[in-house]
Amino acid sequence: MSVFRDDFLWGGACAANQFEGAWDVDGKGPSVPDMCTNGSHTSPKWVTTGIRPDRLYPSHEAIDFYHHYEEDIALFAEMGFKTFRTSINWTRIFPNGWETEPNEKGLEFYDRVFDCCKKHGIEPLVTISHYELPYALVEKYNGWASRELIGFYMNYCKTIFERYKDKVKYWLTFNEINAGMMAFGQVLSTGTVQGYEGPAMGAPDDPQTRLQALHHQFVASAQAIIYAHAHYPQFKMGCMLAYGQSYAMTCDPDDQLANQQSMNEHNWYCGDVHVRGEYPYFAKRLWKELGVEIRMEPEDAETLKKGVVDFYTFSYYMTSCVTTHKDVEGIGGNLLGGVKNPYLKASDWGWQIDPKGLRYALNEIYGRYQIPLMVVENGLGAYDEKGEDGVVHDSYRIDYLRSHIEQMAEAVKDGVDLMGYTPWGCIDLVSASTGEMAKRYGFIYVNKFDDGTGDLSREKKDSFYWYKKVIATNGEDLA
């Protein structure tokens, strides 16, 4: 008998900007990712202030889900998906972000997507803002640095809540909101890069602006949750964090303290606001050490307290080690920083693979918050090559996912309330961090390459059939 609950939400996850394409079709405006060029593991993608004719912008076509959604959702249904995590592209609904009236053609597209999901018995799990900030809001307001964006976000939320109230039950307010705790989050998450052109992960850091922007996102999230709970009691509202599990490198007390502070900053700062409705006890010292002063309106504290989430979701790909010692090798490709763990292997992109770390993380999060959890991103980005038979034999991906599902099962036995699992990039898509197609996660291979070529045909990998069996047995048969 499976340890996972009978209504466990098995599925997969994607983001609008990474797979929809059709970037300027049917009234859609440009979002921040539409201004990002392609890149690779060794060459950073750039954000530009205008579209350069000599550069390739992978989100413009991506894998063209916009015109392939029926085919793709049918493939998800063939695997047996119970849920599909996707996002709504803000600029399909409000091209600049500040309009009062929505773009009807954009709304109709998501009607079709959600209707197709329902036809196949798939429950949509919708991220309201998944790194898809309207670029016009960056140009005019410096993104979330301006409190004005709370009102624009609320208008967007009210529009999609009312439109899809009978089609979507599960909502996430922001994707990986704790990206705002890190310098790389300024482009994709907070959008606080007005006038900046350069490497997308290398914008000059301004902690004051970044953390003020994050506060505005917290208030916007809370307002959206309060509104949803008041008007649509059937909705379940969640948060989403990039969970950064780390370990102290040694038993040196300095390493232990450094790791504790890293966990506080990367995970609990945002998690506490979302789940407990207030900034954690350590926030004031953190602000002081960063030279930050958060401007808050008198009503913000009450808003945060009332606008707490119903469930907590997170991405989990890797772990890292933290040390105060200077003679230790860092981790390549790990956005959260840290140093190498000698006990772990790494992916082609240098991300250290740690299945037991997922069990550890689930226990840490559940022990702190005691609300239902969901792993909404997990997976192995790899260079997939077709065999002589024309099929991708991705046993390495199956091994990765199997080992992580095994540890999720152990966490459930530990007593963790786990409601679902949606591996990332269930169909190959554009990488958010590097802007490349070569970093493939999917159960479904898409014939699209980094130079923009490819006929966009879809083909099942070995992992497709394996995951279908996992879902059919509710996680019992992992062979």
Could you say what each language-model-derived stretch is?
Residues 54-68, 145-147:
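Active-site mouth loops of central-metabolism enzymes
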Residues 82, 91-93, 131-133:
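A short acidic, glycine/proline-enriched capping/turn motif at secondary-structure boundaries
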Residues 1-53, 77, 96-98, 107-479:
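Active-site region of glycoside hydrolase catalytic domains
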Residues 64, 68-89, 123, 306-312:
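Catalytic domains of carbohydrate-active enzymes, especially glycoside hydrolases
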